[in-house]
Amino acid sequence: MALDEFTAPHFNSSALLVIDTQVDFLDDGASPIVGTSGRLPKITRLVETYRSAGRPIVHVIRLYDGDDVDLVRRAALRDGVSIVRPGSAGAQIAPSLMPDRDVELDSEALLAGRLQQVGRNEVVMWKPRWSAFHRTPLDDHLRDLGVDTVVVAGCNFPNCPRATIFDASERDYRIVLVQDATSEITPDRLTDVVKLGVCAMPTEVVVREIATAPAALQ
């Protein structure tokens, strides 16, 4: 589907959403998602580009605590499986993505629905379900910053990135999916979201667009 004046991304008013790129979902983690570790260098490149440009970054994470988790996860957690447990090493964001590797997640604040500031224009946000927009302050945060374009990358496309893309579309955001910085993408899955007006781009194209975009949001 060709992009037009309504769907073409505005990189000068964009935010990077990094979805669920946490230690437990990497190759040596408690619940590895195939391909996520392999995508990590590209995700890191995106984060460093947005950070250097002073543009907004939202690290979106899961924390499985108690019963407030997806139904499909509840049996495993009830039976003692520990995945992205609050306060655990596995719940931490992949170290290469953080501005300071000594920063630890404030699980209590995040589970209460608050954003955790980890850098200039850079926050961490917990989401209780697949979509980064469901029961979160994400939409308000982006609107307050003047963002109209979301750039999506991270872990396990068929679940959380895809749900986030659908909800972003319903809220009239322009959307970029960074296809080589998102795990578990297949040609069919990519075709499905492109039909929604999503712009699929490789990392280096996004990097170039950010480098040539007008001044960052203040």
What are these regions (language model features)?
Residues V150-P158, D172-P187:
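A short glycine-rich beta-strand->turn/loop micro-motif centered on a GG-aromatic cluster
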Residues E184-C199:
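Active-site-proximal loop->helix
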Residues A2-A15, T44-S52:
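Short amphipathic alpha-helices and their capping/turn segments at secondary-structure boundaries
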Residues C199-Q218:
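A charged, well-structured terminal subsegment
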Residues P41-L145:
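Active-site alpha/beta core segments
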Residues P161-R171:
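Short Gly/Thr/Asp-enriched flexible loops that form oxyanion-binding sites at enzyme active sites
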Residues G29-T36, S82:
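Short glycine-enriched, charge-decorated loop/helix-capping segments at active-site entrances
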